[in-house]
Amino acid sequence: MGLANLGNRDLVDIGYLRKRFIDGEYAISDHAIIEARKDGIVPRTVEKLEWAAINGEVIEEYVDRKRVLIYAELKEEKLPVHIVVDYSFWEEPVIVTSYVPDSRYWIKYKIRKK
């Protein structure tokens, strides 16, 4: 339910994770909201972070930490955004941080530069 077991490795079921956000069964840390606002994701910050969680693309998985990095493009602001979602507790995933990625460190905001 939430995790698919492939041998020793548990992978996130992004469909299940998205459903938690669609159903309103999630949390957002104060830190994620503050960082989003500092980066210009205003007004309706929480709504925009929720939209990113539902519509974004998983670009990195941190299986050991039970977290994913999601990329989305906010159309209104014309801003790329990254959010980190912790799924340690499947019934209520948490957006733990958010930020506008820096192009010096990312290729098309999706691939980490070496």
Please identify what each model-predicted range represents.
Residues 1-114:
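Ribonuclease/tRNase effector modules and their secretory precursors
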